[in-house]
């Protein structure tokens, strides 16, 4: 695990390896407002093997810091973008357990009301362009929101926010299984 500094750079992932096949898994873990672009790989030796099959299952997650992985990499709950990592959150672990590809639309501190304004964005900071839901069709949609809504909202208000958000997700993903969970034990 490493944090790439600003600008363009080269990074040696491995050297001095024995002959044979080797696997490289690149996990890009960025948080809202941070962009990172992979420009390519340079290999020495025989070259690339055939790419593995793409996942046949697809899951889309909507959530708050629990799914975003905010401060996940810090035992002291340090709040820094370098401490973010959804690879080891419920979203990442669940997707790998099912052999699925996944999209994670999660933001630390997010509420049901706030996600209604974000779920269909291509860019967190811009309302346009809107995300084209035909670009990614999940088999399942998982929503873990609501924990941050408890501050200043009544139980009925929170329930209505769930209904509103579920209506939006159902319209966007008419054929997906939708799973809602939270850690607060609401009915």
Which ranges hold each PLM region?
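N-terminal secretory targeting modules
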Residues: 1-62, 66-83
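Hydrophobic, Leu/Ile/Phe/Ala-enriched alpha-helical segments that form helix-helix packing faces
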Residues: 22, 30, 98, 166-169
């Amino acid at each position: 695990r490493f944090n790439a500094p600003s600008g363009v750079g080269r990074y040696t992932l491995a050297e001095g390896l024995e002959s044979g096949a080797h696997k490289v898994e690149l996990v890009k873990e960025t948080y809202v407002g941070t962009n990172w672009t992979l420009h390519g790989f340079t290999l020495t030796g025989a070259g690339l093997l055939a790419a593995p099959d793409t996942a046949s299952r697809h899951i889309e997650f909507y959530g708050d810091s629990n799914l975003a992985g905010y401060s996940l990499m810090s035992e002291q709950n340090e709040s820094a973008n370098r401490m973010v990592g959804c690879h080891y959150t419920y979203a990442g672990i669940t997707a790998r357990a099912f052999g699925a590809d996944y999209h994670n639309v999660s933001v630390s501190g997010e509420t049901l009301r706030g996600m209604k304004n974000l779920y269909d964005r291509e860019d967190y900071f811009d309302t346009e362009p809107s995300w084209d839901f035909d670009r990614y069709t999940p088999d399942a949609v998982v929503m873990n929101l609501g924990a941050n809504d408890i501050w200043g909202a009544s139980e009925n208000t929170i329930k209505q926010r769930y209904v509103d958000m579920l209506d939006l997700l159902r319209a966007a993903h008419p054929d997906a299984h939708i799973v809602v969970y939270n850690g607060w034990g609401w009915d």
